[in-house]
From Swiss-Prot:
InterPro entries: AlgH-like. The lineage of its organism: Bacteria, Pseudomonadati, Pseudomonadota, Gammaproteobacteria, Methylococcales. Transmembrane segments: none annotated. It comes from Methylococcus capsulatus (strain ATCC 33009 / NCIMB 11132 / Bath). This is UPF0301 protein MCA0413 1. One of its GO terms (cellular component) is cytosol. PANTHER family: UNCHARACTERIZED PROTEIN YQGE (PTHR30327), UPF0301 PROTEIN YQGE (PTHR30327:SF1). HAMAP family: UPF0301. Belongs to the UPF0301 (AlgH) family. Gene3D superfamilies: VC0467-like.
């Protein structure tokens, strides 16, 4: 199946960062860096990569999904966006592929099934991982309008920022990648 045609004037930002403009009003997207998973004529979907929500043992997360595990590895959970808060996503390096894995750009993959969590618990998962819940979504043309209005700056995606252990510094670094250092 072919992806939908991209209308004239539409820029496909898939595989790039959306970096919140410094003047964006205080809301969930202020100071956000979003990895754009897909952007086509049907709309866009992305994941905020720098909004830490909490941390805890991987075993507790697996138990919440009904999976027995003694995994004590500490994991961090991130808010991927305000849509579908009950949905979980694992944005990871492309060295793992399971039944629910979708290959993305820039050496990244996205998994949405329990298989990736089980693989991580067994030490057979991807080398780099960002666990998120929820996502950012835009209707057709909405993201294009927000970019044209100046709400978002575009920057090349950088895996060192996606998987950074210092999410509070990611926005400022991404601004530099977008050509707008503070």
């Amino acid at each position: 199946m072919r992806p939908p045609e991209i209308p004239e004037g539409h820029a496909d930002t898939s595989g790039q960062f959306l970096v919140a403009h410094p003047k964006m009003p205080a809301n969930i997207f202020a100071h956000s860096v979003i990895y754009v998973v897909s952007h086509n004529a049907d709309g866009a979907m992305g994941l905020i990569v720098n909004r830490l929500a909490g941390a805890g043992p991987l075993g507790k997360l697996l138990e919440a999904f009904g999976l027995a595990s003694k995994a004590q590895r500490e994991i961090k959970l991130y808010l991927g966006g305000p849509v579908g808060i009950g949905q979980g996503f694992v944005l990871h390096s492309d060295d793992y592929a399971g039944a629910s894995t979708r290959a993305l750009k820039k050496g990244l993959s996205l998994s949405t099934g329990l298989d990736v969590l089980e693989a991580i618990a067994r030490g057979r998962g991807p080398r780099q991982v960002r666990m998120l819940f929820g996502y950012a979504g835009w209707s057709p043309g909405q993201l294009d309008g927000e970019i044209a209005r100046g709400d978002w700056l575009l920057a090349p995606a950088d895996t060192s920022l996606i998987f950074s252990e210092e999410p509070d510094k990611v926005w400022e670094e991404a601004l530099k990648h977008a050509g707008l250092p503070l």
